[in-house]
Amino acid sequence: MDAKKNTGEANNDVLEEEAAIQLIAPGIARNLTQEVITGIFCNVVIYPLLLIYFVLTFRYMTTNIVPYEFIDEKFHVGQTLTYLKGKWTQWDPKITTPPGIYILGLINYYCIKPIFKSWSTLTILRLVNLLGGIIVFPILVLRPIFLFNALGFWPVSLMSFPLMTTYYYLFYTDVWSTILILQSLSCVLTLPFGPVKSIWLSAFFAGVSCLFRQTNIIWTGFIMILAVERPAILQKQFNTHTFNNYLKLFIHAIDDFSNLVLPYMINFVLFFIYLIWNRSITLGDKSSHSAGLHIVQIFYCFTFITVFSLPIWISRNFMKLYKLRIKRKPVQTFFEFIGIMLIIRYFTKVHPFLLADNRHYTFYLFRRLIGNKSRLIKYFFMTPIYHFSTFAYLEVMRPNQLTFHPITPLPIKEPVHLPIQLTHVSWTALITCTMVTIVPSPLFEPRYYILPYFFWRIFITCSCEPLIKDLKPAKEGENPITISSTKRLFMEFLWFMLFNVVTLVIFSKVSFPWTTEPYLQRIIW
């Protein structure tokens, strides 16, 4: 009797193990349950180590390397001190962003200073971004999305994104601008307070984020499209007819205007009033931030995203796919190369700040590569890089698109149960918002690519293919080979940390004087 019982239990274990392993192609399988458990375990183990790393490096940077206001901090700190003195109507005309970060810094100052009286004002203000980056961002923003899409990304990786972590140590606007707009996205995807309250909360966070960076109003539009699209997919039954789905989205927006569109429309109306009052999207010094047609900016953005996402896509098959595309479409590829060269020639804006400020990596990238006087480098070297980066950006998106059956609707009843994926409609919206956000900017600033990266990365999953070897399925009759994305997700984390450590070492060790500045200057993104 016991033997039968043990045999039954053993059979149940085998059945459970087989159920956990899913056959995704002939001879190829994935153990999704194990991948999820491993991902959660890695995040739980790595997160406290990251906390220690960022706290220690913050202390080292603030006390030993830059205990003084660095670059734009003199404007941000100065304006916050003005508010501390109660001068709420006084504004530094050189500041171009809204006062959100100064108000947040003010609140943090009144909370921290009575407890840690020996801490300097600069340290307390910088602490705003550190706390946001290592606590609020991974726990309140990324964690809820991760629980819905544990195979897509690791919170410990995204909180370590190199373009973002630079500002954990400084009093800049980028960290909280990112946190708030992505919190708005998180509310739409996870609906933590139900389908109505969550949308209003999402709109609230999006509106507040515009007090930190004006261009977040564009991302508010993208989030609104998602808020309308996800219930429309089910209620209007999206199918393979692309144009029909656009119409269904529009009709659903009208049908449920008060719950899905009105919350965001309030933000748009308020922003329109701001534009009329200010006569520009830019506050303060408008002459140095006048909008233009800087189309090559999209190639800069795609190149940065491609480099940072290298562990996600790199494989022999991916490179073969690019070569195959060139072979199959040689004429189209030729004209694409010509188009990129023409964009480089006629739509490259060289801002005076870019050529004059050697405290940014973009200064060196532009002089030695992007804007090199040699046509061989500027055109014939950079054009293939831009072309491949655009291909990589779009190709990684392609298999992550939510597709539909021509007739049969999705077997899902609630929007909250939809996968964290975009349709052809929202992919188009994402690319459009990315271009509208960065193309008008005359400045080549990598921090402008933080949000385009995050909005792209959250909706994709990394490849499960081997990095070097070809993926060969098991032969017929043999057990299928099991593939996993865990190694690549872990590599993504290590890849980011490599950038973080290298840039931190450069920032710490490389210094030089400026005649107009009282302290030594250093290099950041």
Curated annotation (Swiss-Prot):
Gene Ontology terms for molecular function: dolichyl pyrophosphate Glc2Man9GlcNAc2 alpha-1,2-glucosyltransferase activity; dolichyl-phosphate-glucose-glycolipid alpha-glucosyltransferase activity
Membrane topology: Multi-pass membrane protein
One term under GO cellular component: cell periphery
Pathway linked to the protein: Protein modification; protein glycosylation
InterPro entries to which the protein is assigned, alphabetical: Alg10
UniProt-annotated location(s): Endoplasmic reticulum membrane
Task performed by this protein: Dol-P-Glc:Glc(2)Man(9)GlcNAc(2)-PP-Dol alpha-1,2-glucosyltransferase that operates in the biosynthetic pathway of dolichol-linked oligosaccharides, the glycan precursors employed in protein asparagine (N)-glycosylation. The assembly of dolichol-linked oligosaccharides begins on the cytosolic side of the endoplasmic reticulum membrane and finishes in its lumen. The sequential addition of sugars to dolichol pyrophosphate produces dolichol-linked oligosaccharides containing fourteen sugars, including two GlcNAcs, nine mannoses and three glucoses.
Name the record gives this protein: Dol-P-Glc:Glc(2)Man(9)GlcNAc(2)-PP-Dol alpha-1,2-glucosyltransferase
Biological source species: Saccharomyces cerevisiae (strain ATCC 204508 / S288c) (Baker's yeast)
